[in-house]
């Protein structure tokens, strides 16, 4: 016997089924591009490689650094003299929340950001911010930044060995926070802090020079998943005051705090300053600043697998792997491209080149996995 279904009920069931299908689709991955030249944050939808939202605010001045909180509810954006905090509950449509001024009157750039011990369920842990010009690192409680007039719980400065600080990372499985220091008129070095006690770690030594060359500028780095090794890029070049262009990535033994090996680049891949890692895939990705190139490094064999020429003069200003590990996004700054190149991590080919009238001087791409 046939059972007839009323038309109204049929329409309702069809609508519910369609909604269930839509809700089961993966959420779009979005990336934030810090466009320094236009003082903007541009939101990229990685499904289409298009810019879907543009953020501007009077306090967002020449942004070059930033970091998502693991809860994915906040994004801390560095700029000149100020840090803006954005509500990212809807990551594709962030909303300005507030401005923090760690040092009133200071016009230095807040470049390095780290969320220490932040959870995925609350806006907690610590937010570390490095000001490269005033050689200071500020440590706030994330919860305090939600209130009025927050003050840092600790400040690291020149007396603690901080000099032109740039990039911060938490070493996996330890309370160690590592910082690159990149003075242009001296050898750069790594410093380590204890994330709980807020003290400088001095054993076996306080500072580690990764190249011991004036103006070498250790820049961005990534840890192996077990925290045993750090892969350190170098930003120093003749244009920035170094006597020569840097041509090596240093591999640091994290336990002994010593340089294990230096990996040379080919002559056309100059100044390998930016690093990201695929912990499951066993690859380290490095972007060179001049004649921008993505260098694909096998972390197990400790050898270069591929050089991917991005074309143009440069500069390349970073490399960011999407959370699903399928694509790499590389900002290409002024004066040449002002674009974001997209590389397929499987085929190792350039699959897109993103441009926009507000994509001026991009300095960083951040995903929710950072």
Predicted regions and their residues:
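Predominantly soluble domains enriched in secretory-pathway, periplasmic, or organellar proteins
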Residues: 13, 19-370
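Bacterial N-terminal signal peptides that target proteins for export
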Residues: 1-7
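Cleavable N-terminal signal peptides
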Residues: 7-8, 18
């Amino acid at each position: 016997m046939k059972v007839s279904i009323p038309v109204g009920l049929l329409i309702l069931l069809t609508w519910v089924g369609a909604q269930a299908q839509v809700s089961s689709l993966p959420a779009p991955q979005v990336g934030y591009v810090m466009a320094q030249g236009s003082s903007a944050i541009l939101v990229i939808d990685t499904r289409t490689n298009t810019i879907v939202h543009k953020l501007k605010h009077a306090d967002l001045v020449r942004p070059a650094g930033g970091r998502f909180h693991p809860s994915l509810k906040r994004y801390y954006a560095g700029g000149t003299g100020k840090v803006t905090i954005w509500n990212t509950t809807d990551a594709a449509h962030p909303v300005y929340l507030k401005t923090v001024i760690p040092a009133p009157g200071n016009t230095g750039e807040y470049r390095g950001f780290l969320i220490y011990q932040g959870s995925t369920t609350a806006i907690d842990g610590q937010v570390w911010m490095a000001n490269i010009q005033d050689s200071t690192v500020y440590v706030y409680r994330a919860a305090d930044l939600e209130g009025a007039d927050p003050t840092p719980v600790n400040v690291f400065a020149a007396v603690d060995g901080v000099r032109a600080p740039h990039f911060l990372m938490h070493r996996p499985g330890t309370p160690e926070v590592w910082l690159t220091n990149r003075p242009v008129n001296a050898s750069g070095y790594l410093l380590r802090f204890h994330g709980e006690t807020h003290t400088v770690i001095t054993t076996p030594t306080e500072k580690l020079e990764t190249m011991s060359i004036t103006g070498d500028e250790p820049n961005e780095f990534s840890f192996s998943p077990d925290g045993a090794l750090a892969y350190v890029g170098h930003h120093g070049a003749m244009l920035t005051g170094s006597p020569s262009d840097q041509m090596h990535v240093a591999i640091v033994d994290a336990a002994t705090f010593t340089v294990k090996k230096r990996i040379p680049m080919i002559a056309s891949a100059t100044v390998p300053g930016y690093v990201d890692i695929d912990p499951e895939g066993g690859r380290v990705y490095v972007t060179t600043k001049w004649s921008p190139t993505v260098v694909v490094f096998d972390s197990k064999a400790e050898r270069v697998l591929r050089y991917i020429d991005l074309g143009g003069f440069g500069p390349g200003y970073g490399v960011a792997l999407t959370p699903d590990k399928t694509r790499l996004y590389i900002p290409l700054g002024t004066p040449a491209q002002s674009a974001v190149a997209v590389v397929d991590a499987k085929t190792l080919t350039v699959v897109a080149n993103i441009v926009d009238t507000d994509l001026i001087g991009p300095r960083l791409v951040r995903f929710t996995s950072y």
